[in-house]
Amino acid sequence: MNKVIELKEISVKYNNKSDLVLENITLDIFQGELVAIIGPSGVGKSTLFKIIINSLKPINGQIKVFDQDILKFNKKQRHNFISKIGFLTQTPNLIYTDNVYNNIIRSTSKYKNNFYKFFSILTRKQKIEIFEKLDELNILDKAFFKVSELSGGQQQRVEIAKLLIKDVELILADEPSSNLDKQTSIEVLKILKNISEQNKTILVNIHDLSLVKNYFDRVIAINNKQIVFDKKTKDISQWQLDKIIKSRF
């Protein structure tokens, strides 16, 4: 199995603060894994994502993503690198006054400031692909609805559709279901699981620990600046997971 992310003895702190946020983190993430990142608030889960996308430099250690040393990237290399990564957050990055279809077109367009120029050169195949992705995500009937008319779960599906159209290789999801009810959260995780089975790698910062066992391949817990737990979910029961989490947090 190919390594997508390799962190070796990474330590991080913000600005000139003396306290480390993460300390000597060593971690490998493999292609096609759906990984839950868990831990108390403020322990460095979001910081880990910033390290992976090279928006925050560690004070020591080595980082490889897609088998590239991202700490040595120039501007062009970083741009190409970021284009392979998709992001999901609590609040989808959408234009709420526009419809679903147009939001997806805008997200893939190099003519973002000239939307109608891009729309006019879309091929029939590209248009069909957009509708196919919306159909896969059960929101085809919402294609020409304004985003503001959709539920929170449907809005997240639109955001996911954007990532599918862009064909990203790695998805970093920072609590994408925290504003959703339990059933909708499960539906979103099922979608992410299906995407990971297509050899896409997905890391999810998640707060609802009851969802970890059934919907993730692997769980990594961070606390006190360290990785304190890293297991395949198939190798541990929900009872064992709950017990270990309670003892570490």
How would you name each of these model-derived features?
Residues 38-40:
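The feature captures the beta-strand-to-loop junction immediately N-terminal to the Walker
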Residues 53:
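Helix-to-loop junction immediately C-terminal to a conserved catalytic motif
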Residues 61-69, 81:
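Conserved ABC transporter NBD signature motif
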Residues 117-141:
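Conserved ABC ATPase "signature" region
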Residues 146-150, 154:
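Conserved ABC ATPase signature
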Residues 206-207:
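H-loop/switch region of ABC-family ATPase nucleotide-binding domains
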